[in-house]
């Protein structure tokens, strides 16, 4: 099923930004789970921080796209990007995705 962007009130450019915010949130969730819950890392601290800084800036620049986004909104509201310690590492989707990446890291490094 395709989504009509006009129905969502988003331009194609806004949709790209929305998807980038969702991607960066996903990366913060999964890689924080790997680090804090599973005691491993498949990206460097510098790479994680680069993604965190980009997400912080995107959320600052486009707050209208982050309101009621439906992707872990409460955890990223007023998020500074300083740490992922408070994120929901034991959330079923987060944990499953982190374990998948850990098990397949030779094929997926730096992707999610």
Language-model features: where?
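Phosphate/adenylate-binding "loop-and-lid" substructures adjacent to NTP/NAD/dNTP-binding pockets
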Residues: 1-112
